[in-house]
From Swiss-Prot:
Protein name, entry field: Genetic interactor of prohibitins 3, mitochondrial
The encoding gene: GEP3
GO terms, molecular function: GTP binding
Domain of life of the organism encoding this protein: Eukaryota
Task of the protein: May be involved in the mitochondrial lipid metabolism.
Gene3D superfamilies: P-loop containing nucleotide triphosphate hydrolases
Length: 551
């Protein structure tokens, strides 16, 4: 439970963050203290070699320098810069070898980026300092920690990557906060003090965020939700600096050639690799101090995606700047018709969506990678398996995003999706989401299934942007009398993992629903109704039969 933050954690091992380590003694990317003696230990770096005037006359002469401190420095030297200028240059920030290999070459061992528990991370936060919860909007409800929100007196929740869900920046400061305040109030019983959304990439709502942050706020969230990227956007927008940066350097000491380099030295370490940040790092942004904490994991032993997904695919998925925001506005779709043989839709093998027979469906993907439709899951995995071990490129190689080991049906779990009407969004933790729309005249043809590699979490939700937009219209037209969030039905749900040989999935899903809600009788819905009658008829309001999500 998160409640240990203010008491047990600090009684057992109170380690308040200190900015006493000088900025040149810590890796500018991950924050680890640097050392140059033992390459096998964390924090190892090679000291940059000084340029010697008289011995080196051109930039080509210094390209013998092999480590990134020097390579990056060479790249940043502008044409016309003399060696004397470079010699007198303000010292640049340093990076450890682990981060250099990971950031610049995409070479890393996941064991060097181990998960941290919430208990470990929270030790860096003094008792009286405000926490800002950071979560990824495209992956809601994943990354939202109910325990943190209910244990903070002035809770602040910031959703990142809003441009991957919302069409316009105005929704981040108006429609979304109203919707989520009502959502947490009526569905979780929480009074969240402030809810905001931002887009670091498009610079949406940064001023609104900064004005709502208290001094000495700590950014807390899971790995790769965008904490460090958000910090960098604030630094760039408001000329922020790292704490402990040499304050004796004044503007008149910095020439134009050095200014760009100086600004770059202030930025937080950002990468598509989870757990890059290893130590709490502080920044001065405008008149406020803000701290970037390492990401924490609910399960420190969870399987890293690197074991499942090919490195180039994982890089596409994780790099926010590669996301095509045109999809949010235009929503291009692929049509798939369900068959008796189990026709399925996939993006790289990250999942296989299997619609029920005779259903006609549209899929809009918000995940990078080429989609493909296979005859069935078994055939798909056989095809992906044949991609490996061939001397010549396989014609379907570009559609395979999983490692060789995962081209095996036993590595997958069968998720059954509870009944829905119209459209839903299927969310994959740390990957993204797709929109699934059932088209044509409504009829219940059976339950949808999605086969997902073991270790990847999945849930469903009603389309988020539609909920926010329609809720806001209802809220304003009623002059704030009607909630912007529907109260009478669940809006998110877990899937139901079943045995591959289970035939009566509809009866099994009811059994599993009753089991899941055994200690939450008050949330049970429609259990006295005839389930077949509920799903056989189209309703004005989606009944969302057997929807349930455990926060």
């Amino acid at each position: 439970m998160f409640v240990v933050r203010r008491s047990i954690v600090f009684q057992q091992s109170r380690r308040q963050f200190s900015g006493s380590i000088a900025w040149l003694q810590a890796c500018s990317s991950c924050g680890i203290k640097l050392q140059s003696k033992n390459p096998a230990l964390i924090g190892y770096y090679t000291k940059p070699k000084p340029l010697e005037v008289g011995k080196v006359e051109t930039l080509e002469d210094v390209k013998y320098m092999l480590f990134s401190q020097d390579i990056q420095k060479i790249k940043e030297i502008e044409d016309g810069t003399t060696l004397e200028d470079e010699k007198n240059r303000i010292p640049h920030s340093l990076i450890c070898k682990r981060c250099s290999d990971a950031v610049h070459q995409n070479k890393y061992d996941v064991m060097d980026f181990k998960n941290c528990s919430l208990k470990e991370v929270i030790r860096s936060v003094p008792n009286d300092k405000p926490i800002v919860s950071i979560a990824s909007l495209p992956e809601f409800p994943f990354h939202v920690n109910k325990n943190i929100l209910e244990n903070e007196k002035e809770s602040v929740l910031v959703f990142t990557k809003a441009d991957q869900v919302l069409k316009t920046s105005s929704a981040t400061s108006t429609r979304l906060p109203i919707f989520f305040k009502d959502y947490f109030k009526y569905h979780l019983g929480l009074q969240v003090n402030k809810v905001l959304a931002v887009s670091s990439l498009k610079k949406w709502n940064l001023s609104g965020l900064l004005s709502n942050l208290r001094n000495n706020s700590y950014f807390l969230g899971n790995p790769n939700v965008g904490k460090s990227t958000l910090m960098n956007s604030l630094i760039q927008r408001y000329n922020g600096t790292k704490l402990d940066f040499n304050s004796n350097i004044s503007d008149d000491m910095v020439n134009d050639a050095q200014h760009k380099h100086l600004r770059k030295a202030q930025l937080a370490g950002v990468s598509h690799i989870p757990n890059l940040t290893r130590e709490c790092q502080g920044y001065q942004v405008d008149k406020k101090r803000i701290y970037d904490l390492p990401g924490y994991s609910e399960n420190v032993d969870e399987l890293p995606l690197e074991r499942i997904v090919k490195s180039n695919w994982l890089e596409w998925v994780r790099k926010t700047n590669l996301f095509d925001t045109k999809k949010v506005k235009k929503k291009p779709y692929i049509t798939i018709k369900g068959t008796e043989n189990g026709r399925c839709y996939t993006i790289g093998g990250l999942f296989f969506l299997q619609p029920p027979p005779y259903s006609i469906n549209q899929i809009i993907k918000f995940i990078p990678g080429e989609p493909y439709i296979f005859k069935n899951v078994t055939r798909a995995l056989e095809t992906f398996k044949s991609v490996y071990g061939n001397d010549t490129p396989h014609p379907l190689e570009k559609y395979c995003g999983i490692n060789d080991e995962y081209c095996d049906i036993t590595k997958y779990q069968r998720h059954v999706i509870p009944p829905f009407q119209g459209s839903i969004e299927i969310v994959f933790k740390d990957i993204g989401y797709i929109l699934l729309r059932s088209t044509g005249r409504y009829s219940f043809n059976g339950l949808y299934e999605i086969w997902v590699p073991k270790g990847i979490s999945v849930c469903i939700r009603e389309p988020l942007e539609k909920l926010i937009e329609e809720g806001y219209v209802q809220y304003t037209e009623s002059k704030n009398k009607i909630s912007s969030c529907p109260k009478g039905r669940p809006l998110v749900s877990s899937t139901y993992i079943m045995d591959p040989n289970e035939e009566d999935t509809f009866a099994k899903i009811r059994e599993m629903y009753l089991d899941r809600t055994e200690n939450e009788i008050s949330v049970r819905r429609l259990v006295k109704e005839d389930p077949l009658e509920v799903v056989s008829n189209k309703h004005d309001t989606p009944p969302n039969l057997y929807w349930h999500y455990k926060w």
